[in-house]
Amino acid sequence: MPVKNLFDLAGEVALVTGASSGLGARFARVLAGHGAKVVCVARRRDRLEALVASIAAEGGTAMAAEADVTAPASMAAAFDAAQQKFGTVTILVNNAGIARQARLLEQTDAMWREVMDANLNAVYSVAQMGAQRMVAANVPGSIVNIASILGFGVSKSLSAYAVAKAGVVQLTRAMALELAGRQIRVNAIAPGYFVTEINADFLATEKGAAMAREIPMRRFGAEGDLDGALLLLASKAGAFITGASLVVDGGQILGLRGG
């Protein structure tokens, strides 16, 4: 295959969770921009519809599917809607997640369960659902789970998040081992700190600037910095890659506790 065609996603159907904003919205745009039909999944329908309109204006093809990743029935409905409109999902980007900060001694059981449900249990459930449908349709596929550098190290006040993301890393490896024979690749992307609409104001403060200076490349991740990693793992360019966790963090993990 010519090198120029390695990242071509024409004929693929991609489903992206947490697509209403931030990294998820960017992932949806990138996949659509390279030819995939994209199913944008999140809870905020108004944001999803705006994203779909934006993708269409750029020449891409997308649909909105309102769903909660922690509610299996609603995710099954999203997969059904994707199947009906575009066909079997062949690229799954498990991006949805939450972060809750609390020191260990003050953290509540409810907070722990909330973080685990959104960041680990839902990743397992959605990935299993996607894989089952790929196998039933007898098609190859790619599952990309969004982990974090905190899956490899730790940070104060984020114990639940770090444990969940470490679980995503191991889940990715376990799924890759079991699904390789079905021609389904499973990989993870582990981002460092990225600027999003949620944290942009804080990261622009002096405290945020001090945090950036601790990163070897002296900046936070910006829009577009994950494009290459996503396309590599989703496309034919990564046809022989499975079970990997690709760290994209400007070297931040090098100074992380336990990293």
Go through the PLM ranges and name each one.
Residues 2-5, 153, 231, 242-259:
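Short C-terminal tail/terminal secondary-structure segment
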Residues 34-50:
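Conserved glycine-rich Rossmann-like NAD(P)H-binding loop of the short-chain dehydrogenase/reductase
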Residues 103-104, 111-116, 199, 211:
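Substrate-binding pocket helix/loop in short-chain dehydrogenase/reductase
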Residues 127, 164, 172:
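Active-site helix of classical SDR
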Residues 132, 177-181, 239:
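Alpha-helical segment proximal to the catalytic Tyr-Lys
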Residues 148:
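Residue(s) in the substrate-gating loop at a strand-loop-helix junction
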